[in-house]
């Protein structure tokens, strides 16, 4: 996920056009490379968030029906439609989540339905931040943030296992983390 000022290479376009544009700009096919998935904890997080997002309106309709404010059919209809939809969106979000280190670029993918790709030249990385929410800490996940010298821009690798995040940062910027890593 990008933060700070960002530049879009092309407006919404067919995948082939977007990939060809990226290959011309990057000078390689980094976006074509297979990405490393973020594991079962990230998958659980994506599925849980998808289902909980659709469970809230279903629960509200169930409560309204239980209090005789509404008939039962809206709650049942919402459950039949929204819960599988939330699950499908969670699966899609996990499928699109990944990262790779390819030919001097950190490549990250995230998003739902349309998905987003970003590639950052590793020579532009000046530092790393590991961020964790309370929920990520319990799942053993972190958000790895690559800080760049380009103003306030950064690139986030969402919900990656902590040990993978440290290894990725060390591989992307050899020597930068060495003083901070335990022998």
Model-derived segments and their meaning:
Residues 1-183:
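N-terminal basic, Ser/Thr-rich segments that initiate or prime the first beta/alpha elements at protein or domain
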């Amino acid at each position: 996920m990008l933060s700070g000022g960002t530049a879009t290479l092309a407006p919404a376009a067919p995948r082939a056009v977007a990939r060809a544009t990226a290959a011309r700009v990057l000078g390689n096919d980094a976006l074509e490379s297979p990405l490393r998935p973020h594991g079962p904890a990230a998958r659980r997080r994506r599925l849980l968030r998808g289902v909980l997002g659709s469970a809230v309106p279903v629960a509200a309709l169930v409560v309204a029906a239980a209090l005789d404010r509404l008939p039962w059919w809206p709650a049942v209809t919402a459950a039949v439609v929204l819960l599988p939809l939330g699950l499908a969106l969670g699966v899609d979000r996990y499928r699109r989540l990944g990262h790779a280190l390819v030919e001097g670029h950190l490549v990250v993918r995230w998003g739902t339905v349309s998905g987003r790709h970003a590639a950052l030249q590793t020579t532009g990385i000046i530092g790393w931040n590991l961020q964790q929410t309370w929920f990520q800490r319990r799942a053993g996940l972190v958000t790895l943030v690559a800080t760049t010298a380009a103003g306030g821009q950064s690139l986030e690798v969402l919900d990656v296992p902590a040990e993978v995040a440290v290894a990725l940062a060390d591989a992307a910027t050899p020597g930068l983390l060495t003083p901070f890593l335990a022998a």
